[in-house]
Design a protein with these regions (language model features):
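Carbohydrate-binding surface patches
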Residues: 126-129, 134, 183-226, 257
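Glycan-recognition surfaces
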Residues: 29-147
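C-terminal beta-strand-rich structural cap/linker in extracellular carbohydrate-active enzymes
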Residues: 245-267
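Aromatic- and acidic-residue-enriched carbohydrate-binding clefts of CAZyme catalytic domains
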Residues: 12-32, 38
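Solvent-exposed beta-hairpin/edge-strand motifs
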Residues: 222-240
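Extracytoplasmic/secreted cell-surface and envelope-processing proteins
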Residues: 12-18, 59-62, 215
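Aromatic- and carboxylate-lined catalytic core of secreted/periplasmic carbohydrate-active enzymes
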Residues: 117, 123-185
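Active-site groove signature of glycoside hydrolases
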Residues: 1-17
Length: 267
């Protein structure tokens, strides 16, 4: 499909002393009038995906997606920033078709390139948010000097071709934080690191490690709405390994600056 990004739309919600239409007296009225006209013009052409950025949550009916984290690149701190928005705002996917985690960059412009673990974390970020829009320089004859086209192509072959992870992203739904109150840094200003997405066939548990060192933990089955008899198998999607889950819950270990996705096959 074709898409159109409409940026800084919150500026159209600023209250003013007067408006072009003198019958309009509030910012919300002006926003609705302007966007209604915009959408009516867009609808005269081919179907268009409208991606809103730096946009108010309401009114929501003018966009297919709303960017929840802006100017987000590929380092692990950027994934944490984006997933912080999912931690507190996953529910906006209930009315916007997609929560947009920003373009998913594998290799940026810094001399210190992103690790493959950071790449997995960033694409997990997209799958958890329910929207994947990749953004690297993949040129075969690059003359821009931006990024590293050869490395981006190599990483894309490794990271973006995972069928199971892509299938999760294809649901287009935002996962929810497993706990809703447990920030990774215990300071009240960070993202959660465990997210759950429940579908008809599968239940996905994503664990992202924002720290430099390995983390380990356990998620109780009850917390996931599961019982030992409600699933038949568990697979970790990035490695492809089968995982044994006991009655006491899902035990996980995640290397520093990396992510894992556990997929429960429901009975």
């Amino acid at each position: 499909f074709e898409y159109l990004k409409v940026d800084f739309t919150s500026n159209g919600m600023v209250q003013a002393d007067s408006y072009y239409n003198k019958d309009v007296t509030t910012a919300v009225e002006a926003y609705n009038e302007g966007f209604s006209h915009f959408i009516s013009e867009v609808d005269k052409g081919e179907p268009m995906f409208i991606a809103l950025s730096i946009a108010p949550i309401f009114p929501y009916q003018y966009g297919n997606s709303r960017r929840i984290a802006c100017d987000t690149w590929g380092k692990i701190g950027q994934s944490e920033y984006s997933l912080n928005a999912v931690s507190g705002g996953w529910w906006t996917n209930e009315f916007y078709q997609y929560n947009d985690p920003d373009h998913l960059v594998l290799v940026g412009n810094d001399a210190d390139k992103e690790t493959e673990g950071e790449n997995r974390a960033r694409i997990t970020n997209g799958a958890v948010s329910g929207m994947v829009l990749v953004s690297d320089n993949y040129s075969l004859e690059d003359k821009s000097g931006r990024g590293d086209a050869k490395l981006s192509r190599e990483r894309a072959q490794k990271i973006l071709m995972n069928k199971d992870v892509n299938e999760m992203a294809d649901f287009g739904r935002s996962a929810r934080p497993v706990y809703g109150y447990r920030e990774y840094n215990d300071k009240g200003d960070g993202a959660e690191n465990c997210f759950v997405l429940d579908t008809e066939k599968y239940l996905y548990v994503s664990v992202v490690n924002y720290k430099d060192n390995q983390i380990a933990g356990k998620v109780a089955l009850e917390r996931l709405g599961l019982s030992p008899s409600s699933f038949s198998s568990v697979k970790e999607l990035w490695s492809g390994d089968d995982v044994k889950v006991g009655k006491d819950g899902l035990s996980y270990t995640v290397p520093g600056k990396d992510a894992k996705i556990y997929r429960f096959l429901k009975k």
